[in-house]
A protein has these predicted regions:
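Phosphate- and other anionic-substrate recognition elements at nucleic-acid/protein interfaces
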Residues: 1-136
C-alpha cells in the first residue's frame, strides 16, 4: 500500500503543450473531474489554485504524480516542486503496465490522468522526487 493512501492525490498526464489533471479525494473518489491546463503561466497558476483548494478542503497535503515524458514534464514538475513538498515523477513503464490491466484498451488523456492519480495513491511504487536539469 502506498504511503499516500489516505491523502488527496493529483494525477497529471503531460503532453507537449498542455496537460490533463485528475484529483482524487482521500477516500479515493474523484474530487474534481479531469481538466486541461495549458503549459503557460496562466495554466500553471490555475493548477496551483486547484491544488490549494483541495488542501484547504481536506486540511492535508496533496501528493502530486506525473509520468516522465522526456522534456515535456520538466517545467511543470519544477513549478509544482517549488510550491508543494509531495511532487513525484513516475516511470512510464509503471503506468504502461497498469494500462495493460484493463480489459478494454481505452486511451485518452483524462483516463490517463485518473490512472496516474490512482497509481500514486494505491500502489507502492518507486518514485522520483528530483529531476536533473543537466542535459549534457
Amino acid at each position: 500500500m502506498s504511503k499516500f493512501f489516505n491523502s488527496p492525490t493529483v494525477g497529471i498526464d503531460v503532453s507537449a503543450d498542455f496537460s490533463f489533471v485528475a484529483i482524487l479525494a482521500p477516500n479515493g473518489d474523484v474530487f474534481k473531474k479531469p481538466f486541461r491546463i495549458k503549459h503557460d503561466v496562466s495554466g500553471f497558476n490555475h493548477l496551483l489554485k486547484e491544488i490549494k483548494k483541495v488542501e484547504e478542503e481536506f486540511n492535508m497535503k496533496t501528493a502530486i504524480f506525473m509520468e516522465s515524458t522526456g522534456v515535456y514534464h520538466l517545467s511543470l514538475f519544477h513549478f509544482l516542486n517549488k510550491n508543494f513538498d509531495n511532487t513525484f515523477v513516475i516511470n512510464p513503464l509503471v503506468t504502461k503496465c497498469n494500462k495493460n490491466v484493463d480489459i478494454r484498451k481505452v486511451k485518452n488523456d483524462k483516463k490517463d490522468a485518473l490512472s496516474i492519480a490512482q497509481i500514486g495513491k494505491f500502489q507502492n511504487i518507486k518514485l522520483s522526487q528530483s529531476v536533473s536539469m543537466d542535459i549534457f
